[in-house]
């Protein structure tokens, strides 16, 4: 069984994590490293995917500045999303040819990993036809956003953002994923209290490894 090297990065700026992803993706492409996973939390950040439209940021620049929110144009797929402390972000750096070579199947695997984590807490996670991510309450509220990129050499970057206990008011600054008629929720809201972030991270690692047939090892640094 192949290994998955896991980096627990704590709180890290979006651009710093993005640069780390690019560096690791080059190393994965050349075979210097195996499949790798970054787990982290971002400070308040709005990111724009390759399908995002400016009008999906509804806050003014002054409002964003007052809340300390930065805006980053990303190279991931998808539209606009919001990151904040209390949100578990996972960036898999995978060689896709070892996992079926199908981006759609890979994204479904990411969704399934979150659905299994939610099930462990007694929450029913669901997919919504035509949309990406994981939803609850019959698709009424999104609990996990997904946006990925596949390089020319077939290596994945970016990934998923699972709302554990972020300040959900930050999502009022945007139209999340360009979808205006559905809400946003978190594990804390659904459970009535927030589970420990480290516990959720461990369960996500186990779920990803089960789905993609990997064995986790912690990075030395």
From Swiss-Prot:
InterPro entries: aa-tRNA-synth_II/BPL/LPL, BPL_LPL_catalytic, Octanoyltransferase, Octanoyltransferase_CS. Gene3D superfamilies: Bira Bifunctional Protein, Domain 2. Signal peptide: none annotated. Disulfide bonds: none annotated. The active site is at residue 177. It holds the Pfam family LplA-B_cat. The record marks 142 as: Lowers pKa of active site Cys. The keyword Transferase applies. Pathway: Protein modification; protein lipoylation via endogenous pathway; protein N(6)-(lipoyl)lysine from octanoyl-[acyl-carrier-protein]: step 1/2. Keywords: Acyltransferase, Cytoplasm, Transferase. The keyword Cytoplasm applies. Its EC number is 2.3.1.181. Substrate binds at residues 76-83, 145-147, 159-161. PROSITE patterns: BPL_LPL_CATALYTIC, LIPB. It is an enzyme of class 2 (transferase). GO terms for biological process: protein modification process. Residues 31-216 form the BPL/LPL catalytic domain. It catalyses: octanoyl-[ACP] + L-lysyl-[protein] = N(6)-octanoyl-L-lysyl-[protein] + holo-[ACP] + H(+). One of its GO terms (molecular function) is lipoyl(octanoyl) transferase activity. It comes from the Bacteria. It is found in: Cytoplasm. One of its GO terms (cellular component) is cytoplasm. Belongs to the LipB family. In the reaction, the free carboxyl group of octanoic acid is attached via an amide linkage to the epsilon-amino group of a specific lysine residue of lipoyl domains of lipoate-dependent enzymes. Catalyzes the transfer of endogenously produced octanoic acid from octanoyl-acyl-carrier-protein onto the lipoyl domains of lipoate-dependent enzymes. Lipoyl-ACP can also act as a substrate although octanoyl-ACP is likely to be the physiological substrate. This is Octanoyltransferase. It comes from Chloroflexus aggregans (strain MD-66 / DSM 9485). The lineage of its organism: Bacteria, Bacillati, Chloroflexota, Chloroflexia, Chloroflexales.
